[in-house]
Amino acid sequence: MKKKTGQLYEGAYVFSVTLSEDARRKALEKVTSGITNYGGEVLKIHDQGRKKLAYTIRGAREGYYYFIYFTVAPEAIAELWREYHLNEDLLRFMTLKASAVKEVLEFATLPE
């Protein structure tokens, strides 16, 4: 088995609901190709679908949520963030160090 190099991260990405399914797929591909372009490896992608945002972002009240587990050198994170800030289809993103890849994501339902 090949040893993975780099730090394990969990990335949360919220894309605009104005994107068509094809455009959303291309926007997600842009994020994942950015990871691999910096020598990283995408391990798992969780598509959480369309969800209501906690607050309005650039006029949007909903977004498409994706969680991506990936490995990459820590030095590459700043470059990835720079690319994310330039991506107009990406409403919000967050990158955290992870200890393990979660095969299933479970979220508690919040009261309305």
Curated annotation (Swiss-Prot):
Residues annotated as transmembrane: none
SS bonds (residue pairs): none
Keywords, comma-separated and alphabetical: Ribonucleoprotein, Ribosomal protein, RNA-binding, rRNA-binding
Any single GO CC term annotated in Swiss-Prot or TrEMBL for this entry: ribosome
Leader peptide range in chain numbering: none
Molecular function (Gene Ontology), one example: structural constituent of ribosome
A GO biological-process term: translation
HAMAP family on file: Ribosomal_bS6
Listed PANTHER family: MITOCHONDRIAL 28S RIBOSOMAL PROTEIN S6, SMALL RIBOSOMAL SUBUNIT PROTEIN BS6M
Family annotation (NCBIfam families): S6
Biological role: Binds together with bS18 to 16S ribosomal RNA.
Family: Belongs to the bacterial ribosomal protein bS6 family.
Name the UniProt record assigns to this protein: Small ribosomal subunit protein bS6
Organism: Chlamydia trachomatis serovar D (strain ATCC VR-885 / DSM 19411 / UW-3/Cx)
Lineage, uppermost ranks: Bacteria, Pseudomonadati, Chlamydiota, Chlamydiia, Chlamydiales
